[in-house]
């Protein structure tokens, strides 16, 4: 049994553990308040951009970061702009190398997303707007797009 926060490594079993989660950056801009807080006849246009980044940090640990930018505007004004960078450090050990990247870019963000969603909801509500609940994100498709983009960026080798 692991003691004192150590990771248990019995029998080379696969290990996937969340070591920590953290809020790295949060910005909420409400540039046209209080005018932006008035009732509206139609829903604002919401634009959401997300990026997943990951870097190894020490042996078998990965820092996975979700970056979101959420903008809401009506036809004339920006209503709000939220930028959030939220991360987690994950311990991944005794897992085949071919499974590491999907784990880091799909499962890790999937575990972080509910916290990101709650922070965005709280920020918009604290800014005077109804809470914005972001729909679930398909991290599999984002990962596939990332792989496709990386393959396009690789120079072709000619003999």
From Swiss-Prot:
Domain of life according to the entry: Bacteria
Q: Name one GO molecular function term.
A: unfolded protein binding
GO CC, alphabetical: cytoplasm
Name its cellular compartments.
Cytoplasm
A GO BP annotation: protein tetramerization
Give the keywords, sorted: Chaperone, Cytoplasm, Protein transport, Translocation, Transport
Main subcellular location = cytoplasm
The record describes the protein's role as: One of the proteins required for the normal export of preproteins out of the cell cytoplasm. It is a molecular chaperone that binds to a subset of precursor proteins, maintaining them in a translocation-competent state. It also specifically binds to its receptor SecA.
Q: How does it assemble?
A: Homotetramer, a dimer of dimers. One homotetramer interacts with 1 SecA dimer.
User: Which family does the UniProt entry place this protein in?
Assistant: Belongs to the SecB family.
The cross-references to HAMAP family, in alphabetical order and at most eight, read: SecB (MF_00821)
Protein name as it appears in the record? Protein-export protein SecB
